Amino acid sequence: MAVTLGKVRLSYVTLVDAKDSTDVEHPKFASLDQLHEMLGDAIRAGEVSDYKFSVNVILPKDAKVPGTSELIIDRLEKAVMDAIDYAASDRSKTKLPTKYVPTLKKLWKDSGAMLTETQNILKTVVRDGDTDERAQDKPYLHGAYNFTADQRAYRRNQLSPIPVFAPGAGRPVELDPSEVHSGDYGFVSVTPYVYKFGKAYGIKFFLESVLKTEDGERLDGTVSAESAFGDVLEAYAEQSQDVFGEVASQEAESGKSMFG
């Protein structure tokens, strides 16, 4: 069942070109047009299913659901608990052994603890920014949980982008995915699920949609044009204003336009 989380921060945003991480050291990217071409190639058609859109969701531990006293992480936990219970039920094809349910529920938001306690039998993509070694030099992850949510570009027998929106008058309006950058803030709709890989089981998240609410300081190593050239443009504008102010003054005195 999908759950909406926000306000959260977005990192490692991959919404324009889908990413194939089969080779972790050398990931590949492809646009929807390129994936369409691949589908028409009998040799490469099978590769399309490896391409995914994704974002890394940074969820502050003390962040609350807007207008309520409920923590966002608690809302997510309810959805995760439901997903685990479903995976252990007779209705699920995953057939999660009931003996794993307590541990999966207890450690679902700490991948490090899960790894230590279960020796890779159980996994989770959720990391605790206060204990994860990889977060030590990333202060924006401290005091927060983070996890990757993704979705195949080819799903339901067709190629589809992730729906991306911005706030509108009374309802969200569509937003070009290229307008969402690593570091921006917003809301995400995700669906937690339990997967099976060999003898291991784990928690992952489908990415359903993204709502961008505001720009944030870039986390991808780039800077916006405003940040890069803001001071220069401001100084240029002031200088231009002085020049044209002087021109206007001279015109007023002479009664003639200096531009003909």
List where the protein language model places each region.
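Exposed beta-sheet edge/beta-hairpin loop segments within beta-rich domains
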Residues: 157, 161-185, 193-203
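OB-fold/S1-family single-stranded nucleic acid-binding modules
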Residues: 197-218
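Acidic, gly/ser/pro-rich intrinsically disordered tails
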Residues: 1-3, 217-260
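Signature of extracytoplasmic/envelope-associated structural regions
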Residues: 145-161, 173-177, 219, 236
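Solvent-exposed residues in well-ordered beta-strands and their adjoining turns
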Residues: 58-62, 193, 213
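Broad gene-expression machinery/nucleic-acid interaction feature
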Residues: 52-54, 185-187, 202, 206-207
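OB-fold ssDNA-binding interfaces and closely related basic DNA-contact patches used
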Residues: 1-146
